[in-house]
Amino acid sequence: MKLSCIGCGPGDPDLLTVKAVDRIKKADAIFTPTSKEGKPSIALSIARKYINESTTTITNLIFPMIKDKDSLKVQWKINSQIIADTVHTGKNCVYLTVGDPSLYSTWNYIHKELKEKHDDIDIEIIPGVPSFFAFAAQAKMSLVEGDQTLGIVPACYDLDKIRQTVASCDSIIFLKDGRYFDSVIEILFETGFSDNSVITIAQDVSVDEEILETKKLKDLRNTKNPAGKYFSIMVARKND
């Protein structure tokens, strides 16, 4: 009994690995995450061109965007049981996730439940291209060089944690949340980034709607997020 978890990358279907495409094409059942009932799955939209929908069943699993850990754990158990029940029928099963399964992924919650309750299932994890690697390629930039350090901030609401990370790293990757853009820019100034430090901001990396802008830090002070209210990724380099 085998389950393949596939990292679908940032958005461009052509960035899926050869192994990922092979598993998707052979799948009898595909599971894909979404935040609420009726909302399209991003991971599914990336992989759809490789799915034979006439022979493959597709199940959307709900991962609500809430902070109540108890409620979340209940949903994780439900989702993992749905997957396990199907795997135990002997079908070729695939779980899709955006980016890479090891990085801020819904897969990690499923994986923990399966290891604890269904350790008879053989799990295969196929890596995907993280959004910030696709971002760096599109921007034709280096994230870090030599002995430089790199920090990743998954969301920007904990400003103290951001301050600690920024103070100790040469390059910072900010993911997902642009509501605190002004505060983040000020923290960069406070923690050693110069007026000429390079800031690159992107939305919708690797798809047709992609927006990518590079500016000096001094040009972003007292301005709104140049890529809009929400940014997918912002990279700040201290020394360029």
Summary of predicted features, one role per range:
Residues 1-13, 18-20, 25-122, 212, ...:
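Class I S-adenosyl-L-methionine
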Residues 3, 166-240:
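A contiguous loop/helix-start segment that scaffolds small-molecule binding in enzyme catalytic cores
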Residues 22-23, 87, 95, 142-146, ...:
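Solvent-exposed alpha-helices and their adjacent loops that cap or buttress functional pockets
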Residues 32, 60, 95-97, 125-128, ...:
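General beta-strand structural signal in soluble alpha/beta enzymes
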Residues 37-40, 130-133, 181-182, 207-209:
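Short gly/pro/ser/thr-enriched loop/turn and capping motifs at secondary-structure boundaries
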Residues 71-80, 139-141, 165-168, 212-220:
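Short, surface-exposed amphipathic charged segments that create phosphate/polyanion-binding patches used
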Residues 76-85, 142-154, 218-232:
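A polyampholytic, Gly/Pro-enriched intrinsically disordered region
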Residues 102-168:
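Class I SAM-dependent methyltransferase SAM-binding "motif I" and its flanking Rossmann-like core
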